[in-house]
């Protein structure tokens, strides 16, 4: 499975935030979508024209009592909200602390990022960034490269070990393996590691939720691990 950042499809497990709680086996329920008209009223969605892919935003670190309607209200300050959705655990029916918002235009989406990324809401700083469109050039090429569900995790705090790294990513799906790379002589962490998830969607979710998040004062980097090309014999 070759990964992109988050996709706008209601399938599989999805992104969660650093402070979010672990979900059993990555169970996810997509909350009811709130679609908003130009007048600001909630519509049933009939005759709805799909907005630009680039106008879709990932919103992380939400307070757990924020529902889709309240999420839409937060983004009203940036323009017309077309779709707002908070993601829920399908087993507990509890918010997973993140969601998605689609603005009417790309310009309004950019304004929303400027206004609301880092915005303090009930003691939690929101994470707002653009969700990569489908068919993004970030998709790894096929052919000589072997597909991978492995991600590189950089700029880790020095005291983060393999166990904590695995726990961090388990909030976003099933972790197949996790490893913090250590110095062979000293045994100390080298500040980076690798995590393998069980599916492409979980890789996408983890990247969207964790890349750039602050962990113990350090902004963690998360991206698809590069695969070495197969050797020809």
Curated annotation (Swiss-Prot):
GO biological process terms on file: chloroplast rRNA processing; mRNA processing
PROSITE patterns: RRM
This protein's record includes keyword Repressor: no
Any Pfam family matching the protein: RRM_1
Any one GO molecular function term: mRNA binding
Keyword hit for Iron: no
Primary location group: plastid
Entry-linked InterPro entries: Euk_RNA-bind_prot (IPR050502), Nucleotide-bd_a/b_plait_sf (IPR012677), RBD_domain_sf (IPR035979), RRM2_NsCP33-like (IPR048289), RRM_dom (IPR000504)
The name this protein goes by in its record: 28 kDa ribonucleoprotein, chloroplastic
Ranges of biased composition (kind: Polar residues): 1-16
A single GO cellular-component term on record: chloroplast thylakoid membrane
SMART domains linked to this entry: RRM (SM00360)
Native organism: Spinacia oleracea
Span of domain RRM: 55-133, 149-227
Compartments (UniProt record): Plastid, Chloroplast
Keywords in alphabetical order: Chloroplast, mRNA processing, Plastid, Repeat, Ribonucleoprotein, RNA-binding
Function, in words: Probably involved in the 3'-end processing of chloroplast mRNA's.
